[in-house]
Each structure stands twice: as C-alpha cells, then as structure tokens.
Amino acid sequence: MSIEILNESGHPLDVKRLAALSRFVMDRMRVHPLAELCIKAVDEPTIAQLNEQWMEKAGPTDVLAFPMDELRPGLVDEDPEEGVLGDLVLCPDVAARQGETAGHGTEAEIELLTVHGILHLLGYDHAEPEEHREMFGLQDELLAAWRAR
C-alpha cells in the first residue's frame, strides 16, 4: 500500500504510527495491497476553507474525506480492486480539543479520526441511524483491534 502523510499543521504528528494504523485498517477492510492513500494534516484556517468549499459548512472541522476511485471493502472470496482510495485531511488542533473533551488526548483522537476518515473513503456514512450504528460499530472494532495488538 502506498500511504503518503503530509504534515502542514504546525502540530507534531507521529507519521510512522499514523501510516501503520492506516495500513492496519486497510488490511482489515481487505483493501487492495496496491491501493493509495494520502493523509494531510493542516491548520484550522485551511480546514475551515476546505470545509466551506467542499461541504458548504462554515468553520473548521476535524476530518474531511475525499474518495477517488470509489473503492469498497473487499469480500472474503473476492480479489479487491486496485486504485486510489483517496485523500484525508485532518486538523490536529481540532483533534486536540475534541480529545481533551473526550478525555483521551490528541493522539487517540487523531487515530479515531483516521479510522473514521478511511471508513468514509470506503463508502461508509452516518447520516441515517442504521448507517451510524454500522459505521461507528466498525470504527470501534477497528480501534480496539489496533490498540490490542
């Protein structure tokens, strides 16, 4: 898997751990081994501008997901499709505030947002109650497996 991580946020970021987490999630979701993912960490003004431009929402957000080739999780008996999974844009400053509020710190929040974003890239959503249960249940499972290894 090709995982590119760019940190333009001014906030320290454990790039190796983030790449390992991304690889772990993509493996668990049976994404093709040659799939590509780019994660970019940005500051609040940058993510606020992207949020306004692409989501038509004012203000900063924690993570934005931009799928490319509409890859989906692989099935047990099928070969997954090759392609570009897409781009994630994270804001560590927003993650720091959310992590503090949740009581688990910035790094844990960035991990959560990374898993959340990858699931969005794979077509998961949480607009409807059933989708919310499925996506957040899977997110919790993946994070628990990552932290238990």
Swiss-Prot record:
SUPFAM superfamilies in the cross-refs: Metalloproteases ('zincins'), catalytic domain
GO biological process terms on file: rRNA processing
Main localization of the protein described in the UniProt heading: cytoplasm
Binding locations of Zn(2+): 116, 120, 126
InterPro entries: MetalPrtase_cat_dom_sf_prd, YbeY, YbeY_CS
Alphabetized UniProt keyword annotations: Cytoplasm, Endonuclease, Hydrolase, Metal-binding, Nuclease, Ribosome biogenesis, rRNA processing, Zinc
One Gene Ontology term of the molecular function aspect: RNA endonuclease activity
Location in the cell: Cytoplasm
PANTHER family named among the record's database cross-references: ENDORIBONUCLEASE YBEY, CHLOROPLASTIC
Described function: Single strand-specific metallo-endoribonuclease involved in late-stage 70S ribosome quality control and in maturation of the 3' terminus of the 16S rRNA.
Name of the molecule in the record: Endoribonuclease YbeY
Gene transcribed to yield this protein: ybeY
